Amino acid sequence: MPRTHAIEDYRNFGIMAHIDAGKTTTTERILYYTGKSHKIGEVHEGAATMDWMEQEQERGITITSAATTCFWRDKRLNIIDTPGHVDFTIEVERSLRVLDGAVCVLDGNQGVEPQTETVWRQADKYDVPRVVFVNKMDKIGADFFKCVADIIGRVAGKPVCLQLPIGAESSFKGVIDLIKMKAIVWSGEALGANFAEEEIPAELKDQAVEYRTKLVEACVELDDDAMTAYLDGVEPDEDGLRRLVRRAVQLRAFHPVLCGSAFKNKGVQPLLDAVVDYLPSPVDRGAVDGLDFKTEEPVKREPTDEDPFSMLAFKIMDDPHVGTITFCRVYSGKVESGTSVLNSSRDKKERVGRMLLMHANNREDIKEAYAGDIVALAGLKDTRTGDTLCDANKAVILEKMEFPEPVIEIAVEPKSKADQEKLGIALSKLAAEDPSFRVSTDQESGQTILKGMGELHLDIKVDILRRTYKVDANIGQPQVAYREKLTRRQEIDYTHKKQTGGTGQFARVKFVVEPNEPGAGFSFESKIVGGAVPKEYIPGVEKGLNSVLGAGVLAGFPVVDVKVELVDGAYHDVDSSALAFEIASRAAFREALQKGGSVLLEPVMKVEVVSPEEYTGSVIGDLNSRRGQIQGQDMRGNANVINAMVPLANMFGYVNQLRSFSQGRANFTMQFDHYEEVPRGEADKVIAKYA
């Protein structure tokens, strides 16, 4: 099937928001209006619309199905879902990695909230152009201009209004379009389908002129010709203004702000127009960077069907009907179902079996996908989130996604043999779906250990195990994922010698072991010259070192950020072997860690507490008692916002404590920030507990 829409007519965008800002309702209304204007698949207009407006559960699943395709003004919109909760930052990261643009939804009453700040920062990191939709303008306390001020004050954004609200709270009835200089007023209860353009109400005329001038001035600054004309008294016409706003969005020069009430069906069609008019197509975003699979030289892949095929897997889901589904974004070239492609991240061949396009309310089997498409592939065997799939003859590895290390863990013990089998299958599926969720086995106790980004993250995984996979298990208390680190450079010369009649064992290694940069991990280099340790024994050396990394000398926690150089050694023609060098390396490395002043590291969390002012003293006192360091505080509306860095070990059960002394009126968010050395007294307690 040939391409139905030119790549210039694609908009791959996400809707990002704090958890209750109305993201789902906005997405839902977008699907409703786009579904009405285009029959999707074979479903009758009325049936499709009603089906998926009513079946909340189905729709919930569809929207989280990571990508939904719909159409507006003959443009093809691929909406990529981004969750709003801090424990799932990884989900947001991987969505933003494949987006070309975003709509940031704000709650008109709350303005910029903690998760809004987090997703905004991540969008900045990936340079994602965005427009802002101030939602819930019908809500008591809604304040459009406070939201605009928040964008400047809290996320250092550059808001420029394209619309102003007409009325607020229960009297909100429409918006002023500052480009057309018309009022758009919705009427009746026809699910927002009926609206009319009218003259701007007299009492709002001056305000509209003021904000229109701000818009025009922000636009003409980007174009010398437009600026010259403006200084001569000639304003850009409607099309010219739209062109300049589009350019501003692409350059991230400013963020257009619109408003409405998705729940009351007001303002959604103009928002769709803004997506089409201002957010970039894949062509606007340009070529994607990668590395040549063979030479590792930097290469680019252009967003055209003619370039060699490349795509990135950004989400994996388990579907009850189809099995494992891998969501991918095609960056260049085209791919047909039934063909064989290379997973260049793992150097494995994959066969593209079923290829699906996820619509708002159904799945469509497709035979081929082109640059710019977002598709779901069924039945891939070895592909994980962040992997590149490409043409084997022109192989490329696209820029990898970075996944944070887990900071919290719990032990899980199945109650019966049948549960043990179900647990194994379920955990391998969950780990494939979520790269920030890890599973390991404790070597000594044999327990299964689940690791994640926070208490909520692991609670949800346990809930899925019980409800979806019907696994009955005992769950241990959450534990902190401590780390160990060397602090002083060591030179260790170690000889392993064993003679027991017959062939003996002999290996000598000399290491220089020193601390690595924070976050640099483990590195090993052999500096052997002249064959003091033959090449065939080097893998044995590495194996010995790696066996110590998993369990350090203080309390058996993983060792991080250490650099090892093999500088000398000796071998015996008969008695040396890879095993002998493995044993020698293990013993030498442990000795270096013991003598090199190893210390314990703990995860430190960035905590934000939003509390009524009268509880501020209690909140700060409590955080101090948890070894917290207060970073600052400011006012948000009539609430006080306290920012602190607190060790994760002291944050378990915090939610209940905070609720009890604030009578449920304060709330908090936290996310991992960095690892830090544990104070001596605390470290001794931890070592005594685990060693």
UniProtKB/Swiss-Prot annotation:
Function: Catalyzes the GTP-dependent ribosomal translocation step during translation elongation. During this step, the ribosome changes from the pre-translocational (PRE) to the post-translocational (POST) state as the newly formed A-site-bound peptidyl-tRNA and P-site-bound deacylated tRNA move to the P and E sites, respectively. Catalyzes the coordinated movement of the two tRNA molecules, the mRNA and conformational changes in the ribosome.
CDD domains linked to this entry: EF-G, EFG_III, EFG_mtEFG1_IV, EFG_mtEFG_C, EFG_mtEFG_II
HAMAP family tied to this protein: EF_G_EF_2_B (MF_00054_B)
Origin species: Methylorubrum populi (strain ATCC BAA-705 / NCIMB 13946 / BJ001)
Family listed: Belongs to the TRAFAC class translation factor GTPase superfamily. Classic translation factor GTPase family. EF-G/EF-2 subfamily.
UniProt xrefs under SMART domains: EFG_C (SM00838), EFG_IV (SM00889)
Short name of one Pfam family: EFG_IV
Subcellular location per the Swiss-Prot or TrEMBL entry: Cytoplasm
Domain tr-type G: 8-283
Protein name: Elongation factor G
InterPro entries associated with the record: EF-G-like_DII, EFG_II, EFG_III, EFG_III/V, EFG_IV, EFG_V, EFG_V-like, G_TR_CS
GO biological process, one term: ribosome disassembly
Keyword list, A-Z: Cytoplasm, Elongation factor, GTP-binding, Nucleotide-binding, Protein biosynthesis
Coiled-coil stretches noted in the UniProt entry, renumbered to this chain: none
